[in-house]
Design a protein with these regions (language model features):
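N-terminal intrinsically disordered, cationic/polar leader segments
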Residues: 7-10, 14-44, 52-54
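Active-site- and interface-proximal helix/loop "cap" or "latch" segments in soluble metabolic
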Residues: 36-205
Length: 205
């Protein structure tokens, strides 16, 4: 395996792409704001343009089924005068649910010449942000004593949105086994102790 070292100290990047998401409560729903900037750190902003893209995507999500209720795309900085003409197309996100199949549907609707590469990227990456925001809202309720279980609403067997989302949440995998052994997300140390810790505890009980 080839180990890639970090860039040399003081090296100036050729390109910087920054993506940020913020999720806010909106009654029972969520509002997620995605922001993308692309810049050239070597440029002085005079002889050469420093910021080449600055774009924003705002969506409203119904938390019951993770369906998009509203979507607004805004281009603040763009390379062609005509670029903002595609902003309104992203209202086509409305009605989609950010569960399995969402990424494929976004690519089908907005990929390539049907959309904007950068706004499509913001839209495509929404899924994990929404899932984490829902989990964070539950964690907030636990921290306030309003709930005892981070999985409230998930049937007590794990978030249906987390299932098969990664190697930890594979069906029958590490998270499932920890849940069976009594672990509840949002409780105890962070990160969660290794699975063997829970299994040993189970055997000694």
């Amino acid at each position: 395996m080839t180990v890639v070292p970090p860039p040399a100290e003081g090296a100036v990047a050729l390109h910087r792409r920054s993506i940020d998401y913020q999720a806010y409560p909106d009654g029972d729903d969520l509002v997620v704001v995605g922001h993308l900037t692309a810049s050239r750190p070597w440029a002085d902003g005079t002889a050469a343009v420093a910021t080449v893209h600055d774009m924003e995507l705002r969506v409203k999500i119904r938390t019951d089924d993770l369906t998009i209720l509203g979507a607004t795309a805004v281009m603040h900085t763009f390379p062609h005068t005509e670029c903002p003409g595609i902003e309104s197309a992203f209202a086509g996100l409305v009605g989609l649910s950010v569960v399995r199949g969402y990424t494929r549907e976004v690519q089908a609707r907005f990929g390539g010449p049907r959309g904007c590469t950068h706004l499509e990227h913001l839209a495509r990456s929404l899924g994990p942000v929404v899932i984490q925001a829902v989990t964070s809202r539950r964690a907030l309720a636990v921290s306030r004593g309003e709930s005892e279980d981070l999985l409230a609403g998930g049937g007590g067997t794990g978030s249906p949105w987390a299932r098969d989302s990664c190697h930890i949440w594979a069906e029958g995998g590490i998270a499932d086994q920890k849940l069976t052994a009594g672990w509840r997300p949002g409780t105890g140390p962070y990160p969660s102790p290794a699975l063997v810790t829970f299994l040993d505890r189970d055997h000694s009980a």
